[in-house]
Curated annotation (Swiss-Prot):
PROSITE patterns for this protein: GGDEF
EC number: 2.7.7.65
Site (Involved in oxygen binding and important for the stability of the Fe(II)-O(2) complex): 43
Pfam family, one: GGDEF
Gene: dosC
Protein name, UniProt field: Diguanylate cyclase DosC
Residues given in the record as substrate binding sites: 341, 350
Residue numbers annotated as active site: 376
Comment on bound cofactor: Binds 1 heme group per subunit.
GO annotation terms (biological process): cell adhesion involved in single-species biofilm formation; negative regulation of bacterial-type flagellum-dependent cell motility
Organism: Shigella boydii serotype 4 (strain Sb227)
Comment text on domains: Is composed of an N-terminal sensory globin-fold domain that binds heme and oxygen, and a C-terminal GGDEF diguanylate cyclase domain.
Residues the UniProt record annotates as site (Critical for restricting water access to the heme distal side to avoid rapid autoxidation): 65
InterPro entries referenced in this protein's UniProt entry, alphabetically: Diguanylate_Cyclase, DosC_2nd, DosC_GS, GGDEF_dom, Globin-like_sf, Globin-sensor_dom, Globin/Proto, Nucleotide_cyclase
Cofactor annotation: heme; Mg(2+)
Length: 460
């Protein structure tokens, strides 16, 4: 890649050097005068494509992209020799963002085609001479083509790396502590079954019961299991069983009086037992040949390391956009960890990190993700958790750690606490923006005295 970018730098530099300075000046003049119009027209046309609309529907994104597009047009069409290296780096950065968000390369290529199409009438309606118009157009199109090639090559490299990490995560997820995960999910669906059966037999209110897709097992399957076992037939079978039973469940909830009829009640109970039994059988088959493997896991805390953060965020953001369900993130910092570590030593510091990590595991659902983000910093991705649920989870974790007892080697008690920043997904497709605003909330929590939870709001 390094040799390729050097070659493209030489080519772009050659284009600029060989162009008549007057033509370059006129291309820059066109760019400055018409960048705003070109940007608006560009996004108007691109958004007609329903696939592109998926990535541009967020108002904040559209506003930021339009101004960024204006700057990009001016930079590329006004390039001087000394600008070329910086411009190549800009294309690389833009490509990384596209890959991180998951924008398909065909949309990027369509965008360049649209830009060249709308640039043509702008240049040829100017008051330049016919020869000047042709030369300005030639210089502008060649500049855009070089920028496009650099961006596409960088995008392909970034996207390929991301795809490789997606597959690595899938394999890691399959292998990581499989036996324990299997038993946990079997226990989860059995617990859901027992809860409903007891309520029916005791003639209790079923209103608080959840359909299978919204129970803990259903959330785990939709957010993790479906991805873990991607491409395996049993996944489709389980999906259909959940979907079919949800239909039966919802119909029953609309008229619970039918359960007073013994034959209908027995039929419903047998449908529950049959569905759960089939799902457990399929789950055992899926997990049968899976064994433990810890690549991608933080050795000390047994949490995910940040390697798989892009893979998970990309998938969960796509799910949230597709289904309209909430998504949130917590960024967590151990208060005064460096001071504790320096005072009591690394062994004590490691023990604190292990205890804190256990508190995370004990207070999140199996559909959530917990990462060790840095030394004493952690990220939790909460799937389908409302703002209130997000804050309750954060407060539960904070309270649990505050009550954790830890003694130093000399018997002295060590006080532990966490500062937590929370943020709700607002439609912006770049997960780094979600992390950024959660980090801003974390900063507020620290500034307001630590040992507290703060939710990011635009007014913060």
């Amino acid at each position: 890649m390094e040799m390729y970018f050097k070659r493209m730098k030489d080519e772009w530099t050659g284009l600029v050097e060989q162009a008549d300075p007057l033509i370059r000046a006129k291309a820059a003049e066109i760019a400055v005068a018409h960048a705003h119009y070109l940007s608006i027209e560009f996004y108007r046309i691109v958004r007609i494509d329903p696939h592109a609309e998926e990535f541009l529907s967020n108002e904040q994104v559209e506003r930021q992209l339009k101004s960024a597009m204006e700057r990009w047009i001016i930079n590329v069409l006004s390039a001087q020799v000394d600008d070329v290296e910086r411009l190549i780096q800009i294309q690389h950065t833009v490509a990384e963002v596209h890959a991180r968000i998951g924008i398909p390369v065909e949309i990027v290529e369509m965008g360049f085609r649209v830009l060249k199409k709308i640039l043509y009438p702008v240049i040829f309606s100017s008051d330049y001479s016919a020869a000047e118009k042709l030369q300005v157009y030639h210089f502008s199109i060649n500049s855009i083509d070089i920028a496009m090639e650099v961006m596409t090559r960088a995008f392909t490299f970034s996207d390929s790396s991301a795809s490789k990490e997606d597959e690595n995560y899938r394999i890691f997820s399959l292998l990581e502590n499989a036996e324990e995960e299997k038993e946990r999910q079997i226990a989860s669906i059995l617990s859901w079954e027992i809860d409903i059966i007891y309520k029916i037999l005791l003639d209790s209110d079923l209103g608080s019961s959840l359909p299978l897709s919204q129970a803990d097992f259903g959330l785990w399957f939709n957010h993790k299991g479906r991805h873990y076992f991607s491409g395996i037939a049993e996944v489709g079978h389980i999906s259909r069983l959940i979907q079919d039973f949800d239909g039966i469940f919802n119909q029953t909830m609309r008229n619970t009086r039918n359960l007073n009829n013994r034959s209908l009640r027995v039929k419903f109970l047998l449908q529950i037992r049959n569905t759960v039994s089939q799902i457990i059988t399929l789950l055992r088959e899926l997990f049968e040949e899976v064994s433990r493997h810890e690549v991608g896991m933080d050795v000390l805390t047994k949490l995910l390391n940040r390697r798989f953060l892009p893979t998970i965020f990309k998938r969960e953001i796509a799910h949230a956009n597709r289904t309209g369900t909430p998504l949130s993130v917590l960024i967590i910092d151990v208060d005064k960890f460096k001071e504790i570590n320096d005072t009591w030593g690394h062994n004590t510091g490691d023990e604190i990190l292990r205890k804190v990590s256990q508190a995370f595991y004990d207070n999140v659902r199996s559909s959530d993700y917990v990462f060790r983000y840095g030394g004493d910093e952690f990220i939790i991705v909460l799937t389908e958790a409302s703002e209130n649920e997000t804050l309750r989870t954060a407060e539960r974790i904070r309270s649990r750690v505050e009550k954790t007892k830890l003694k130093a080697a000399n018997g002295e008690d060590i006080a532990l606490s966490l500062s937590i920043g929370a943020a709700m997904f607002n439609g912006h497709p770049d997960y780094e923006r979600l992390i950024q605003i959660a980090d801003e909330a974390l900063y507020i929590a620290k500034r307001r005295g630590r040992n507290r939870v703060e939710l990011w709001k635009a007014s913060l």
